[in-house]
A protein has these predicted regions:
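Active-site core of metal-dependent hydrolases
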Residues: 1-92, 100, 106, 182, ...
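Helix N-cap and loop-to-helix transition residues
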Residues: 19, 53, 94-96, 118, ...
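Predominant activation on well-ordered alpha-helical scaffold segments within soluble catalytic domains
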Residues: 24-27, 31, 96-99, 120, ...
Length: 277
């Protein structure tokens, strides 16, 4: 479906674009749509935007859009520097410039294709400006303090689902979503942020995870979905003892038939299954 009917019907959209050249083309189209249909208050947004320019940030602000950023550069920073140089990597993405322009900004992971789903790795990247390999990419003006980084992960993200005021903060009348952490995020050394974890997770007022001193509160795993999944009725879909170790190295040989196959023999003989995880 094109942007014109989406704007006409007041349906939000998101566009995935890493390079500014792509964002430029997308904004040209959105501006044409905006001449006939308002795109404000739709909560549309651009994902990624690592190389977006100040001009296009301002265009997004004028059109009422947002930007969702992810910590892909924490994993790909060295490769970006090798190709484009350290100077070009300093503002990938230009987070504080986005915030200064008044654009709604939310943080996530883009897992599991290009980054870990671990939020603490993302928060470490936002605060330190370093890759997981320790390469310093960002100057101080493109790094966030810990509170601001955490708010991008919580309160700010509610804008993108049109749920501002309903979730994202531990306050009355919002969803009771919270986590008790293994250590204090605000006081641990920078290099320990990525190692944090939740020992108690509450979602909608219900405990959904417990470990360490909260192990006794840890609920059983929910049954596999959908309810017709063969995992719920057939034991041969379960990993047998020892097979996990056997398949752990499977993706080192990507050619068809070169894996150590699992018991069912399905993913292995079709070639590399890295894409599935």
């Amino acid at each position: 479906m094109g942007l014109f009917p989406m704007a006409e019907n007041r349906w939000p959209w998101r566009l995935h674009a890493t390079y500014n050249e792509t964002i430029e083309l997308a904004l040209n189209a959105i501006e044409r749509v905006a001449k006939d249909h308002s795109v404000h208050n739709l909560h549309w947004f651009i994902d990624h935007a690592e190389t977006i320019t100040a001009r296009n940030i301002d265009r997004i602000a004028c059109l009422g859009g947002g930007i969702a950023i992810q910590h892909r550069m924490a994993y790909q920073g060295e490769y970006f520097i090798e190709r484009y140089g350290a100077k070009a990597a300093e503002f990938t993405p230009p987070i504080n410039r986005m915030l200064a322009a008044g654009v709604p900004v939310g943080a996530g992971t883009d897992a599991t294709r290009v980054a870990s789903y671990n939020p603490w790795v993302s928060l470490s990247w936002l605060v330190t400006g370093k890759t997981v390999g320790g390469t310093a990419m960002y100057p101080a003006e493109n790094r966030l303090d810990r509170e601001r980084a955490l708010r991008l992960w919580t309160e700010a993200n509610a804008w993108f689902s049109s749920e501002s005021g309903r979730k994202g903060a531990i306050v009355p009348d919002q969803w009771a979503d919270l986590a008790v952490l293994s250590a204090d995020y605000f006081t641990v050394p920078d290099e320990e942020i990525s190692g944090l974890s939740s020992v108690l997770t509450i979602l909608g007022g219900k405990i959904v995870h417990g470990s360490d001193e909260y192990q006794d509160d840890d609920p059983p795993l929910p049954p596999a979905m959908p309810d017709w999944s063969p995992v719920r009725s057939r034991s041969d879909f379960l990993v047998r003892p020892g097979e996990r170790r056997q398949t752990a190295h499977a993706c080192v040989a990507h050619g068809p038939t070169r894996h150590s196959h699992d018991g069912a023999g399905f993913w292995g003989h079709l070639g590399c299954s890295c894409w599935a995880f």
